[in-house]
């Protein structure tokens, strides 16, 4: 089972596109169910703005002030620390991007003493929401597709896209530019994103 859980495939085999795709193991999907449930409680609270994870995908605070996703919030660190997800992602990182390094050489980006905690957050998007072309901080980044309705993530510099099947995850070098077009369906779209650091650098 463990070997299968650590398998990823290239999004576009035989090309320079560095995006890798994997299916999320059922037990880890159950953990993510809990994360999303907590995120919904934050989103629906009168104090939601206090927990908002602000980045280019949420609000352009240095420009127009336009919100792209309707709401974003980080996952509570205690949920991440006790998860199989963290071990799984760090082992995937070492296997596919580690260049003979140990999984101990990688960690989830973290904001000590800040309400964001770890650099993993839930995105809630609805009709008209988008995510502008951007890249991420760190060495490696990923997107978890929780409830996506086939709304693709477009990887700009490689001219390819991933449809975002529910229950899958992509990982790619953090400098990879990507975006999501405005959502046309009148449905809730839920994804999670995260950033990994190489601690040996």
Provide a role label for each language-model segment.
Residues 1-110, 130:
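Non-heme Fe(II)/2-oxoglutarate
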Residues 102-182, 187-201:
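Catalytic core of non-heme Fe(II) oxygenases with the double-stranded beta-helix
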């Amino acid at each position: 089972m463990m070997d299968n859980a650590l398998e990823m495939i290239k999004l576009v085999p035989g090309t320079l596109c560095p995006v890798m795709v994997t299916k999320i193991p059922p037990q880890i999907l159950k953990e993510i169910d809990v994360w999303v449930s907590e995120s919904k409680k934050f989103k629906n609270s009168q104090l939601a703005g206090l927990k908002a994870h602000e980045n280019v995908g949420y609000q352009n605070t240095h420009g127009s002030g336009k919100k792209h996703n309707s709401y974003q919030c980080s996952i509570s660190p205690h949920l991440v620390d006790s998860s199989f997800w963290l071990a799984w992602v760090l082992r995937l990182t070492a296997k596919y991007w580690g260049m003979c390094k140990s999984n101990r050489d990688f960690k989830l980006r973290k904001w000590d003493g800040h309400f964001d905690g770890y650099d993993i957050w839930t995105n809630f998007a609805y009709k008209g929401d988008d995510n502008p072309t951007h890249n991420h901080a760190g060495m490696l980044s990923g997107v978890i597709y929780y409830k996506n309705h086939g709304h693709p993530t477009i990887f700009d510099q490689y001219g390819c896209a991933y449809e975002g099947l529910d229950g899958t995850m992509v990982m790619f070098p953090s400098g990879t530019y990507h975006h999501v077009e405005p959502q046309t369906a009148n449905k809730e779209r839920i994804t999670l994103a995260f950033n990994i650091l190489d601690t040996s650098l």
